[in-house]
C-alpha cells in the first residue's frame, strides 16, 4: 500500500469517526424521545437531524470506506450490493441483509415526505443504528491492518 493510500484511509476513518460521534449523540437524544403519534416541533427537528446523520454515516461507510477497503484488498468494483456482500465476507458487518435494509432506509430518508411514513422511518432508524455502529467498529478494526491504528 502506498503512503498516499494510507493517508487517504486515515483521513476517511477520521471522517467516519466524526460522523459516528454525532450520530451517537442524536441516537441517544431520539431514543429518549421515543416513537409516538405526535411530536413537538423540537422533537421533530431532533429526529430529522438524526435521520440525516444516519444517512450520512451509512453513505460514508458503504460508499467511501467499503469502496476504499475493496481497493486496498484489490477487489473489483461492482454494485452497492456487491460491496455490501464483500463487507460481510470480510466480517466488516454482521449481516449483508441488514446493510441492504440500511441502504433502503437511507434512500427512504432522502425521498419520503408523508408524515406517517416519516414516523415509520424514525422507528427503523432507531432499530438499525446499533447495526450501523457495529459495522463502523468492525470496519475500523479491519482497517487497522492497513493503518496500525484502532
Language model features with spans:
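Solvent-exposed interaction patches of small proteins and small membrane subunits
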Residues: 1-150
Amino acid at each position: 500500500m502506498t503512503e498516499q493510500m494510507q493517508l487517504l484511509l486515515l483521513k476517511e476513518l477520521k471522517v467516519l469517526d466524526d460522523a459516528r460521534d454525532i450520530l451517537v449523540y442524536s441516537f441517544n437524544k431520539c431514543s429518549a424521545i421515543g416513537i409516538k403519534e405526535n411530536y413537538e416541533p423540537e422533537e421533530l427537528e431532533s429526529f430529522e437531524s438524526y435521520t440525516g446523520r444516519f444517512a450520512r454515516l451509512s453513505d460514508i461507510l458503504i460508499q467511501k470506506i467499503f469502496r476504499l477497503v475493496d481497493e486496498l484488498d484489490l477487489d473489483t468494483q461492482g454494485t452497492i450490493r456487491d460491496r455490501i456482500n464483500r463487507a460481510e465476507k470480510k466480517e466488516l458487518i454482521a449481516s449483508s441483509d441488514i446493510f441492504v435494509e440500511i441502504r433502503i432506509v437511507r434512500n427512504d430518508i432522502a425521498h419520503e415526505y408523508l408524515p406517517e411514513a416519516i414516523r415509520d422511518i424514525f422507528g427503523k432508524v432507531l432499530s438499525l443504528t446499533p447495526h450501523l455502529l457495529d459495522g463502523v467498529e468492525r470496519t475500523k478494526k479491519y482497517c487497522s491492518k492497513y493503518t496500525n491504528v484502532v
